């Protein structure tokens, strides 16, 4: 799993390794989910992320977490 936050773009993303995105689904206009051809979750993107969670102490972040 890879988690990134871009403070300037106000975008938070979570990507699951081994799952290739085939389609992006607009959930709320600011939240998008990416799925593969079989409907498995490939990633989640949150725009305007600081309006949805307290991210004031975060700067640009990139974290990889093995599953």
Language-model region placement:
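A general secondary-structure signal for short beta-strands and their flanking turns/coil
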Residues: 9, 28, 58-60
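Amphipathic, hydrophobic secondary-structure cores in small proteins
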Residues: 17-38, 44
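Proteins with a high burden of low-complexity, intrinsically disordered sequence enriched in S/T/G/P/A and R
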Residues: 3-6, 10, 32, 40, ...
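Structured beta-strand/loop patches that form or line metal/cofactor-binding pockets in enzymes
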Residues: 2-7, 12-26
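C-terminal structural segments of small proteins and small subunits
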Residues: 38-67
């Amino acid at each position: 799993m890879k988690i990134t936050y871009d403070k300037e773009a106000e975008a938070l993303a979570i990507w699951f390794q081994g799952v290739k995105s085939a389609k992006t689904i607009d959930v709320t206009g600011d939240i998008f989910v990416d799925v593969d051809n079989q409907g498995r979750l490939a990633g989640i993107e949150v725009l305007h992320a600081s309006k949805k969670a307290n991210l004031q102490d975060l700067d640009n972040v990139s974290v990889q977490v093995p599953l």
